[in-house]
């Protein structure tokens, strides 16, 4: 993962050879392993490229990269499939080499159509004076734009900053395709034309879908001198997933027979489903595809060579490379169980569980606390060593997600007692929440600005920071997760009707309405969730990875009719995400399989910490910068 930025100026007086310090600071936090800036000047414009790398695979490749023709590339992504990247290679260099070899626009689009994995990029073509940029189909990596000074400058960046009273604020680049700007033309005309190469479905007959609403994701707040147009050659990117199967059953009996034996939410209900040969086969296919997704996201990671014996590695000195945002719910439990298959047994897995407490406690509630102030267990000095959370001991925050998290831990320990499962209790006081929201989180959540964005953004920021308590049979100690990769279950609810609004739509409009709701959820996930979560997690120099949004996982689920994935005639805790619950049963997780959906803002209790009478869609004043 990286922090990438390109600042473009069309006038000398508005050009700076350095990024503003607050923006540079935010970018460096995303990429702690290397930083570099590169200036490219032409007759009519200047470009300042800034790259900050979190090194995770292959040889450390310092960004931005430049070739002998003056082309420049910034890459914030992971190639998990589609383009060949050898184990010892770095995907930044592989992608740049492939781009440099492209002879025309069609070849560039073909390259990005092949990539499976999250990405955002900025690519400068020196010979044509074209600047290309964009995000993957789901928008799993953040990219923002800011246009200012009446057409005299603009900036692209992984993360922005908030400044009180400044009108030209950042917006998310829509994940509707790849954009191209002719810099020479923009400089002469004093207007910026964003040429869009949209995503399209390609049929089996190699026919592209008709261009209908390619511009609907374009933000409404662009200044007058900026316009978005579809490229005149009608070129496009091939969507990386198959269309959603909206087939309806020929008769109600086709689905009623599946649950006629029971309408209760019990383990036996799920076991009955698995007695059906067709259902069991689909569930096993789902597990196999999701398993490959998790494997790719775990093995695409450089691990430190450790020559110590296995006996030594089993001690607390072993470092976790993978962490999971963990509530004990079915999403995180299935991810943890599959991750356990591929992570070396002598390597711990960090389970990050966050809770918010209403007021600061004084003192430590448990005597004989063993504080480890060395190696990766050290409480770091930056923003945290004297923070209220350091005084919030374990056992002080038995919120719903803590209760289900501990139950999930026991279930995982029974599945694999040989694994070291680090259940990290992350307790956040109101004082620390307010302090770090002002200092850090508000800059990351923006340009999203609702109460829901505030709650989720803050919860994910503290969880992914990984500073808390590690409670074992022998001791309780302060702990900081060393994992650079964080797996999260986002995407499961959107695809598998996990939200209450899915059930409401089903009750009012049946399966047809449910299909439309699922399509809408997946279509807006880039603008609603993923850019924000990437900025929030990346702020700790860590990378978010989303197994449920692997292209093959989404294609498999999209190919199934809705009644083979969910059954909302059954009660909460069974009917929604049914195929995932059945997978949990197959993986030996029967208790977790029956837990109903609980959103992180409620499970962690952050929603009740401040104003409890707000609506999720309200604009959140706590995210605004004050004078």
Curated annotation (Swiss-Prot):
The keyword Hydrolase does not apply. Transmembrane segments: none annotated. CDD domains: Asn_synthase_B_C (cd01991), Gn_AT_II_novel (cd03766). Residues 2-184 form the Glutamine amidotransferase type-2 domain. The active site is at residue 2. Residues 373-404 are annotated as: Disordered. Keywords: Amino-acid biosynthesis, Asparagine biosynthesis, Glutamine amidotransferase. One of its GO terms (molecular function) is asparagine synthase (glutamine-hydrolyzing) activity. GO terms for biological process: adipose tissue development; asparagine biosynthetic process; muscle organ development; skeletal muscle organ development; skeletal muscle tissue development; transdifferentiation. InterPro entries: Asn_synthase, Asn_synthetase_domain, GATase_2_dom, Ntn_hydrolases_N, Rossmann-like_a/b/a_fold. Residues 308-597 form the Asparagine synthetase domain. The keyword Amino-acid biosynthesis applies. PROSITE patterns: GATASE_TYPE_2 (PS51278). It comes from the Eukaryota. This is Asparagine synthetase domain-containing protein 1. It comes from Mus musculus (Mouse). The lineage of its organism: Eukaryota, Metazoa, Chordata, Craniata, Vertebrata.
């Amino acid at each position: 993962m990286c922090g990438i930025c390109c600042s473009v100026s069309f006038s000398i007086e508005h050009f700076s050879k350095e990024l503003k310090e607050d923006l540079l600071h935010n970018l460096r936090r995303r990429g702690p392993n290397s930083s570099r800036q590169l200036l490219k000047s032409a007759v009519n414009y200047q470009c300042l490229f800034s790259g900050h790398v979190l090194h995770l695979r292959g040889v450390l490749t310092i960004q931005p990269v430049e070739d002998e023709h003056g082309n420049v590339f910034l890459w914030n992504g992971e190639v998990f499939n589609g383009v060949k990247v050898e184990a010892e290679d770095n995907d930044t260099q592989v992608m740049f080499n492939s781009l440099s070899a492209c002879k025309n626009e069609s070849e560039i689009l073909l390259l990005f159509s092949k990539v499976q994995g999250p990405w955002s990029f900025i690519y400068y073509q020196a010979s044509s004076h074209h600047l290309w940029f964009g995000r993957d189909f789901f928008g799993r990596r953040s990219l923002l734009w800011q246009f200012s000074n009446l057409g005299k400058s603009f900036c692209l960046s992984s993360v922005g900053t908030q400044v009180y009273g400044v009108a030209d604020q950042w917006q998310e680049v829509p994940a509707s395709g790849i954009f191209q700007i002719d810099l020479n033309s923009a400089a002469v005309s004093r207007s910026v034309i964003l040429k869009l190469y949209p995503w399209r479905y390609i049929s089996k007959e190699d026919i592209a879908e008709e261009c209908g609403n390619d511009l609907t994701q374009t933000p409404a707040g662009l200044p007058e001198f900026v316009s978005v147009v579809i490229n005149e050659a009608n070129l496009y990117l091939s969507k990386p997933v198959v269309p959603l199967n909206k087939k309806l059953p020929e008769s109600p009996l086709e689905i009623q027979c599946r649950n006629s034996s029971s309408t209760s939410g019990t383990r036996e209900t799920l076991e009955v489903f698995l007695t059906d040969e067709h259902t069991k086969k689909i569930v096993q296919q789902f597990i196999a595809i999701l398993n490959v997704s998790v494997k790719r996201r775990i093995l695409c990671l450089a691990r430190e060579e450790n020559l110590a014996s296995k006996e030594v590695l089993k001690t607390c000195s072993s470092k976790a490379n993978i962490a999971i945002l963990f509530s004990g719910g079915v999403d995180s439990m299935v991810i943890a169980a599959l991750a356990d298959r591929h992570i070396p047994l002598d390597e711990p897995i960090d389970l990050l569980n966050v809770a918010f407490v209403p007021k600061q406690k004084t003192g430590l509630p448990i005597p004989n606390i063993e504080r480890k102030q060395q190696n990766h267990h050290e409480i770091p000095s930056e923003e945290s060593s004297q923070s209220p959370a350091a005084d919030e001991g374990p056992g002080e925050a038995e919120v719903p997600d803590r209760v289900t998290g501990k139950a999930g831990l026991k279930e995982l320990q029974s599945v694999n007692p040989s694994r070291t499962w680090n259940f990290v209790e992350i307790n956040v006081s109101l004082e620390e929440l307010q302090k770090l929201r002002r200092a850090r989180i508000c800059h990351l959540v923006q340009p999203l600005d609702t109460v829901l964005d505030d709650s989720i953004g803050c919860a994910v920021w503290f969880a992914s920071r990984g500073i808390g308590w590690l409670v074992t049979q022998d001791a309780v100690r302060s702990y900081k997760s060393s994992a650079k990769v964080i797996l999260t279950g986002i995407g499961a609810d959107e695809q598998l009707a996990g939200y209450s609004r899915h059930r409401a739509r089903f009750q009012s409009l049946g399966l047809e309405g449910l299909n439309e709701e699922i399509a809408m959820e997946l279509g807006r996930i880039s603008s609603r969730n993923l850019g924000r979560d990437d900025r929030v997690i990346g702020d700790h120099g860590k990378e978010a990875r989303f197994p449920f949004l692997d292209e093959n996982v989404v294609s498999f689920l999209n190919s199934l009719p809705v009644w083979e994935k969910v059954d909302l005639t059954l009660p909460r805790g069974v009917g929604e995400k049914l195929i995932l619950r059945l997978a949990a049963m197959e993986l030996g997780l029967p208790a977790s399989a029956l837990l109903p959906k609980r959103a992180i803002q409620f499970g962690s209790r952050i929603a009740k910490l401040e104003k409890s009478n707000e609506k999720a869609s309200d604009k959140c004043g706590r995210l605004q910068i004050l004078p």
